[in-house]
């Protein structure tokens, strides 16, 4: 009798570089390369008002190589500028997450609260974030807390609305079981309501963090000081278009990383079958 192991083949070792050659890497890389080539062609001719990729790299490589220089005042590297903006976003978004989740669960759990507050929230959420900035400056009298308030008011609405929807998705059978078992309010919240709402909460958080990053860049252009938004505006006033472009690239990368960070937290908290 032939050995039962005769047909077995040794397992192939995974190439640690295989990810680099995967479609998820190659396709975006090709798209970026095509974009750069088109950009280079369009902006290399005479009369172009925008720099080409090569010119951007030549004019901004000191900023890229030394992102944390500090010459005092607002003359700081891109790393410091982005960190200042991220700090404001972290404070405003964290406050919006706490308040928004609490409000959303309260409204989604009570028909009375939903009927009373939903029309008000639907009106307030349509107000552009920057429209709140003059009100915040008038009330708080300082630029820093005003910028944080703009972040808060920007992020809170998607969090409230999505959490409310999630709290309303608890199946009626679950509610009936909780009554039969005479679960306490805390038991009902932690075992039934919150798990049902978690996927919706993270949807609101992902939308909120993206809007927060958009809003702080715009708000900093108006309030001044250290921050990536004011850096872009100051570069425009100085006709440093290459610096604007490299800053926009950094803004986009940070926005992507923020979204991926919330998605990573979601993968740790939300069971796969609920996604």
Curated annotation (Swiss-Prot):
Its main location: membrane. It comes from the Bacteria. GO terms for cellular component: plasma membrane. Signal peptide: none annotated. GO terms for biological process: monoatomic ion transport; nitrate assimilation. Gene3D superfamilies: MetI-like (1.10.3720.10). Residues 82-262 form the ABC transmembrane type-1 domain. The keyword Signal does not apply. It is a multi-pass membrane protein. The keyword Signal does not apply. Pfam families: BPD_transp_1. One of its GO terms (molecular function) is nitrate transmembrane transporter activity. It is found in: Cell inner membrane. Keywords: Cell inner membrane, Cell membrane, Ion transport, Membrane, Nitrate assimilation, Transmembrane, Transmembrane helix, Transport. SUPFAM superfamilies: MetI-like. The chain crosses the membrane at residues 25-45, 89-109, 120-140, 147-167, 189-209, 213-233, 238-258. CDD domains: TM_PBP2 (cd06261). Belongs to the binding-protein-dependent transport system permease family. CysTW subfamily. Part of the ABC transporter complex NrtABCD involved in nitrate uptake. The complex is probably also involved in nitrite transport. Probably responsible for the translocation of the substrate across the membrane. The complex is composed of two ATP-binding proteins (NrtC and NrtD), two transmembrane proteins (NrtB) and a solute-binding protein (NrtA). This is Nitrate import permease protein NrtB. It comes from Synechocystis sp. (strain ATCC 27184 / PCC 6803 / Kazusa). The lineage of its organism: Bacteria, Bacillati, Cyanobacteriota, Cyanophyceae, Synechococcales.
